[in-house]
Structures are given as C-alpha cells and as structure tokens.
Amino acid sequence: MFCRSPLVAVILLVLATHIVLALGDATRIAASETVPSDSSQTTRKSTRRTTSVDNKRRLRQQIMGKDGPVVNDVHAEERGFLNNKLAYKMFGDGLDMQEKIIKSGGKGLKNVLRKRLYNKVSRAEHRQVPATRH
C-alpha cells in the first residue's frame, strides 16, 4: 500500500494540472469570442526589441532637443546630426549662427558648400575607369 501512494499522488497531480489547463483554455476561448471595443483596437502597440541603433537615436534626440525625423531613416538622422555639429562648430549656437551668417553675407556657408562640391567632383573623377589600350 505504501508503494502505491506516491503513484497515486503523481496521478492526482497530473489530473489537477490537466483540469487547470483546460479551464484556462476555456476562459481564453470565451474571452476571444467577445467583440473588443474600438478603443482597445486603436490603443494596441506593436512590440519589437529595442536595438542599439534605437538607443543611439533616442540619446541623440535628447541631446539635440528635437522630436526626431518623420521618416525612420537612421542615415538621414546621422547626416542631420553631423550637419548640425558642423554648423555649431562654425557659428556657435542657433542665435549666434543667424547673426554671423547675416554679418558675413553667407560667405562661410558658401565656402562649406564649395568644399563639399569640390569633394564630390574629385571623388567622381577617381571613380572613372581609365580607357583600356588595345
């Protein structure tokens, strides 16, 4: 008799587990048959893993004090960050920048644009493949 008591205990435990799981499934099925309200459908939020790119973007947005780009384009955001950094190095903060551009007549900005255009042209020349000799 004593040998069978652990076996009976295991059988009862398994039976109780199956009953609890069956009741859980039944309540979940009954809950899914009810029609959800419109507000619950609109407030659902998609969940995805937060990556290091998201963390960098959030940190950059906090530093720059902006809400961020409308388009979820990491490279465009990085270009904007570098352009803002370059403008800050040249002119200072936003108020100083406007005054310095007005005083210089836009010469500093023209020089920056001229250098960028020159760099693009020189890169394009290096990309050209020389003609092969026969």
Curated annotation (Swiss-Prot):
Residues 37-52 have a biased composition (Low complexity). A motif (RxLR-dEER) lies at residues 57-79. The keyword Nucleotide-binding does not apply. It comes from the Eukaryota. Residues 32-60 are annotated as: Disordered. Induction: Expression is up-regulated at the earlier infection stages. It is found in: Secreted; Host nucleus. Transmembrane segments: none annotated. The RxLR-dEER motif acts to carry the protein into the host cell cytoplasm through binding to cell surface phosphatidylinositol-3-phosphate. Belongs to the RxLR effector family. Effector that acts as a broad suppressor of cell death to interrupt plant immunity. Inhibits cell death induced by cell death-inducing proteins, including the PAMP elicitor INF1 from P.infestans. This is Secreted RxLR effector protein 1.
